[in-house]
Amino acid sequence: MKKTLSLLVTLLLCLTLLAGCAAPEGSDKAEKKNETAEKTSEEVKEAAEKGSEKSSEASEQSSDQAKEATEKSSDEAKETTEKEQTIKVGASVTPHAEILQACVEPLKKQGIKLEIVEFTDYVLPNEACQSGDIDANYFQHVPYLENYNKEKNSDLVSLGKVHYEPMGLYGGRLKSIDDLKEGATIGLPNDSSNQARALLILQKLGWIDFAGKAGLETTLLDIKENPHKLKFQELAAEQLPRSLDDLDYAVINGNVALSAGISVRKDALYIESADSEAAQTFANVIAAKKENAENPALKALMDVLHSKEIADFIEQKYDGAVVPIS
């Protein structure tokens, strides 16, 4: 019994010792776990900080790149704007502004922007050109331009011819030149310049002749020979198409015929030729101040206006009422 009791006491002491030894070991493990956790936390934190720094650096780099791209784009746009030259040209609506519109794209390819300013009268385009509000205009022929310069003491010059609007003979009660009969009545424009052109057409046909050399100042009073005893009725140019039923023939301006729905190509019995004195004299021109005559952009405009592309455009669109000339 005593021996048994001694064994039990010894066993208890051993168990106590074992328990004491186990506790520090568990504590060490716990401490090690804590240390590992702390180390892992620090590593995660450090990695997060590094990631944040890299993200911030990338963001700053991206922002710098975007700023640089924006500045580059702005510089390129500025450079393009500086390279592109703008010219303003005044014009009457038909056919002048329409012809200029066909020049916009060809000029754009050369770095020239063409702005078209439309006018509805024949005074303002020259005034705007003289004052510098526009660089050039397109609506008039040289005699009109010269008269304006004389009256206004201005220095506008022609940069070149573009087109003419041929005057032609049209049938009224008589539908063919061969139908001409004695005493036929022919309608003529009542303004001096257009009437002279009309009389030159009749001379070309052999219907009348003049005492001296005929020119663009010829009048009815200059007629010397009238073998068919023709009668002449003077009317405002725009009234002639409406009066065809009351006339045997009428001599009508190309633009007036166009406005009246008359086909110059199909309906005219005879028209002025491009090399005639009238066509060359009354061809419509581009005009500008003398100091702008050598403007490269205006020279480029003239080159485009004289190109085959624009000549084809004019011939197709206006059915003979407007004819390209250079």
Give a label for each model feature:
Residues 166-177, 282-295:
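A bilobed periplasmic-binding-protein/Venus flytrap-type ligand-binding module shared by bacterial periplasmic
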Residues 18-34, 38, 42, 46-49:
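Bacterial lipoprotein signal-peptidase II cleavage site
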Residues 86, 93-118:
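Short, polar/charged alpha-helical segment
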Residues 147-159, 173-174, 246, 251, ...:
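Ligand-binding "clamshell"
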Residues 81, 159-208, 311:
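A conserved helix-loop-strand patch within extracytoplasmic ligand-binding domains
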Residues 116-127, 215-242:
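Short helix-initiation/N-cap motifs at beta->coil->alpha
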Residues 1-26:
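Sec-dependent N-terminal signal peptides of Gram-positive bacterial secreted proteins and lipoproteins
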Residues 26-33, 49, 67-88, 107-109, ...:
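Immediate post-signal peptide segment of exported/extracytoplasmic ligand-binding proteins
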